[in-house]
Design a protein with these regions (language model features):
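Extreme N-terminal leader/targeting segments of oxidoreductases
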Residues: 1-32, 50
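N-terminal Rossmann-like FAD-binding beta1-loop-alpha1 element of flavoenzymes
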Residues: 28-57
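Dinucleotide-binding Rossmann-like beta1-alpha1 core, especially the glycine-rich loop
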Residues: 78-161
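Helical element adjacent to the flavin cofactor pocket in flavoenzyme catalytic cores
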Residues: 137, 144-147, 171-202
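Flexible hinge/switch segments at interdomain interfaces of large molecular machines
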Residues: 162-170
Length: 202
């Protein structure tokens, strides 16, 4: 049974849409069959086609219909736990490996957008505001870890006095700036991946 999600999201209202593709009838032969037209399926289909594999993607409803086309669109660097906590949990080498893996995933998204000229309203940079003074200690440690293991300039601390220049508000104790983060229109990105996959022969 397919759970039908409503089509009336902001993203659906502001996306361009794709030409209707033929419905699968009968049988088809391919090297790879990808099931699902979300980010993972689209990226997999595109990668397979770019490697010369005959690739078919099947989607029950429409491209980006599920979570891929409805998420917040944020590309937030790092993980959902501070680096020093991850080091305590898994050890230094594993923490570094996970951070680098997350960074490489984000870099792949940026590279796909650039390579295929995907117009998905991409904006660069992410700011994590410090609501409490003690947040700044966590942010400083996070910035040090990112700069040491992902390269200089991967993160920076914004002092409280400069917050207004970045986000137009005051009252915060400072912030953590990660230039490699950002925001995009997720459904436009999904449609761009689909267009690239179609052009590659999917």
């Amino acid at each position: 049974m397919i759970h039908r999600l409503p089509n009336d999201s902001y993203y659906a209202a502001t996306a361009r849409g794709l030409p209707v593709q033929p419905q699968l009838t009968g049988s088809m032969t391919a090297d790879v069959c990808v099931v699902g037209g979300g980010f993972t399926g689209l990226a997999a289909a595109l990668a397979c086609a770019e490697r010369g594999l005959r690739t078919v993607l099947v989607e029950a409803v429409r491209i980006g219909q599920g979570a891929s086309g409805r998420n917040g669109g944020q590309m937030i660097p790092g993980l959902n736990v501070y680096a020093r906590d991850l080091v305590a949990l898994l050890g230094h080498d594993a923490a570094v490996a996970l951070y680098r893996l997350a960074a490489s995933a984000r870099d792949r998204v940026h590279a796909r957008i650039a390579r295929h000229d995907i117009a998905c309203d991409l904006r660069h940079g992410h700011i994590h505001l410090a609501a409490k003074a003690r947040d700044m200690d966590d942010f400083a440690a996070e910035a040090d870890f990112a700069n040491a293991h992902l390269g200089p300039g991967s993160a920076a601390i914004i002092p409280a006095a400069d917050i207004g220049a970045h986000v137009g508000v005051s009252g915060y104790h400072g912030a953590l700036l990660t230039p490699s983060g950002g925001h995009m229109h997720p459904l436009k990105y999904a449609e761009g991946l689909a267009a690239a996959a179609l052009a590659a022969g999917v």
